[in-house]
From Swiss-Prot:
Protein name per its UniProtKB record: Acetyltransferase SACOL1063
CDD domains: NAT_SF
EC numbers for this chain: 2.3.1.-
Free-text function comment from the UniProt entry: Catalyzes the transfer of an acetyl group from acetyl coenzyme A (AcCoA) to an acceptor substrate and releases both CoA and the acetylated product. It displays the highest activity for L-threonine. It can also use L-tryptophan, and to a much lesser extent L-tyrosine.
Keyword annotations: Acyltransferase, Transferase
Disulfide links within the chain: none
Species assigned in the record: Staphylococcus aureus (strain COL)
Top-level taxonomic group: Bacteria
Gene3D superfamilies from the UniProt entry: 3.40.630.30
Similarity section: Belongs to the UPF0039 (ElaA) family.
Single GO MF annotation: glucosamine 6-phosphate N-acetyltransferase activity
EC top class, as a word: transferase
Residue intervals of the N-acetyltransferase domain: 1-141
Annotated positions binding CoA: 71-73, 79, 112-114
């Protein structure tokens, strides 16, 4: 269901999901949504019957740590375990790429979801594009 993005069409599908979720639903400015890290990130996309429904990207921070970013599931596919499957695929990809630690700036409304995946909060709540976030981290091991 989830694939590592390997062509422009797949990347455009990621951007489509992100625009729907972050720009249209959450009011993030469109010019902020696509950033300078796109080319150095590894993108993941999920399709359902050929339609793009979920995406995330990982960005190397150093030799051992990856930052999980732009996690988005289309509204039509929420509440069905899609986010959990997406995060499992993201973690698997990060481990396959040789990373041992994952970090992310999670939207505060999603803290319980990420805690259920064994992410731990670190630091204080901060605003990013007017939305409350908190840093969360997880050690990536074969026991996930």
């Amino acid at each position: 269901m989830f694939s590592k993005v390997n062509n422009q069409k797949m990347l455009e599908d990621c951007f489509y999901i992100r625009k729907k979720v972050f720009v249209e639903e959450q009011g993030v400015p469109e010019e902020s949504e696509i950033d300078e890290y796109e080319s150095e990130s590894i993108h993941l996309i999920g399709y359902d019957n050929g339609q793009p429904v979920a995406t995330a990207r990982i960005r190397p921070i150093n030799e051992t740590t990856v930052k999980i970013e732009r996690v988005a599931v289309m509204k039509s596919h929420r509440g069905q375990g899609m986010g959990r499957m997406l995060m499992q695929a993201v973690e698997s990809l990060a481990k396959d790429e040789g990373f041992y630690v994952a970090t992310m700036n999670a939207q505060c409304h999603a803290i319980p979801f990420y805690e259920s995946l064994n992410f731990k909060m670190r630091g204080n709540i901060f605003l990013e594009e007017g939305i409350e976030h908190i840093e969360m981290t997880k050690k990536l091991t074969s026991l996930n």
